[in-house]
Regions:
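Conserved glycine-rich Rossmann-like NAD(P)H-binding loop of the short-chain dehydrogenase/reductase
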Residues: 26-42
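Substrate-binding pocket helix/loop in short-chain dehydrogenase/reductase
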Residues: 96-97, 101-109, 208, 212
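Active-site helix of classical SDR
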Residues: 120, 166
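Alpha-helical segment proximal to the catalytic Tyr-Lys
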Residues: 125, 179-183
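Residue(s) in the substrate-gating loop at a strand-loop-helix junction
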Residues: 150
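Short, small/polar-rich loop/turn modules that mediate ligand/substrate recognition or access, typified
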Residues: 182-187, 241-243
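C-terminal substrate-recognition "lid" of short-chain dehydrogenase/reductases
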Residues: 220-248
Length: 253
């Protein structure tokens, strides 16, 4: 059986970094990208090298189609195939709608939604080519797309209209694309995360973090590492599990 390959966007820190290490320890070749933090890519590369994991880490912009297409092409050229795509890259923004200008709105939508569209579109032809492989069992998908979404895409959040809209759109993309690709044995799901203890949520004060934790039945934020374990588990599900937006929120909703 050939080594499986995962591609993770937003790989330099938080959930993406934890995913890279979890999939590496599970025996995958790892490809990924980040937008600006090449120093963090270097650090991650050293960790993957220490694990003996083949990897390809690139810096680029996912908000138009050129780099996502190149990223997928380079991944397949390096490793021969692609098995799992995790659309994890994204940004948050806390701001009243009336204080949100056009460029801020477009930045959030393109970062959180358009990037997943571009990467998924580029990956699908290579997933279809996996039908020719003999090392994929009949119940296993020819490809897996997992979109890292948010509970705010399900319920909405005050002062986070752009973010909530982008994640709601990502949930819609997940369900619609799953129906489109199911006849081709390609699975598409989303993990709708609650509050994860990453840099994205470091904007909250200690008092705000404590108040938010009190609203979560588990009484705490999730770690990036346990989120990565959930994504790894989801990537290994039979192809029949598709079109689902699975909440990972400690019972928050």
């Amino acid at each position: 059986m050939s080594q499986k390959t995962v591609l993770i966007t937003g790989i330099s820190r938080g959930i993406g970094r934890a995913c890279a290490l979890a999939f590496a320890k599970a025996g995958y070749a790892v490809a990924g990208c980040c937008h600006t933090r090449s120093d963090l890519l270097d650090t991650l590369s050293a960790e993957l090298t220490a694990l003996g994991t083949p990897h390809l880490l690139l810096q680029g912009e996912l908000q138009n189609s050129a780099f996502p297409t190149s990223l997928i092409e380079q991944t397949v050229a390096r490793f021969g195939h692609l098995d799992v795509l995790i659309n994890n890259a994204g940004v948050s923004m806390i701001r009243m709608l009336t204080d949100t200008d056009d460029s801020q709105w477009e930045h959030v939508i393109s970062s959180n939604l358009s990037s997943a569209f571009y990467c998924s579109r580029a990956a699908i032809p290579y997933f279809l080519k996996n039908r020719e492989r003999e090392d994929i069992s009949p119940q296993a998908p020819y490809g897996v797309i997992i979109n890292v979404s948010s509970v705010w895409g399900c319920s909405g959040a005050s002062c986070e209209v752009a973010y909530s809209a982008s994640k709601a759109g990502l949930n819609g993309l997940t369900v619609a694309l799953a129906k489109e690709l199911a006849p081709s044995n390609i699975a598409v799901n989303a993990l709708a995360c609650g509050v994860i203890d990453t840099d994205m949520n470091r904007c909250f004060s200690d008092e705000e973090r404590a108040a938010l934790a009190e609203e979560i039945p588990m009484g705490r934020f999730a770690t990036p590492e346990e989120t990565a374990e959930a994504l790894l588990l989801l990537s290994r599900m039979p192809a029949y599990l598709t079109g689902q937006v699975i909440r990972f929120d400690g019972g928050f909703l």
